[in-house]
């Protein structure tokens, strides 16, 4: 199998703005970028990257938007812990997983853009 060339992230930490040139995996105008950033709590400081949805993600979003009640891709569970220490340890472990994997910090943005995008 051949190698895949993935462009490096061009959004620098602490940057004051995001421009189209910083987004090699998304085709967005400056007004669309501004609309996306406005929907992220904390604004540009909390945007790590913006890119297009994969075909599978487009399908998941389609079913989510089509669902009248509930979300076919969202499951819930109830967990019980026998002590606060175990709960805190579980929460710390979950935070490590979230910090490590971009997809767990990703949101789909559909408003203010011509095509949906994902924002990390």
Where in this protein do the model-derived segments appear?
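Acyl-group handoff/entry surfaces in thioester-processing enzymes
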Residues: 1-3, 7, 43-120
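Flexible, low-complexity inter-domain linkers and amphipathic docking helices that mediate domain-domain
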Residues: 2-51
């Amino acid at each position: 199998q051949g190698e895949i060339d993935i462009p490096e992230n061009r959004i620098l930490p602490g940057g004051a703005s995001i421009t189209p040139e910083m987004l090699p995996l998304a085709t967005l105008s400056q007004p669309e970028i501004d609309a996306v950033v406005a929907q992220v709590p904390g604004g540009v400081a909390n945007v790590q990257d913006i890119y297009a949805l994969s075909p599978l993600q487009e399908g998941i979003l389609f079913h989510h938007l089509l669902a009248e009640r509930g979300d076919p891709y969202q499951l819930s569970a109830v967990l019980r812990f026998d002590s606060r220490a175990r709960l805190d340890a579980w929460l710390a472990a979950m935070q490590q997983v979230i910090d490590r994997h971009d997809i767990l910090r990703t949101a789909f943005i559909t408003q203010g853009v011509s095509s949906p995008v994902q924002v990390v």
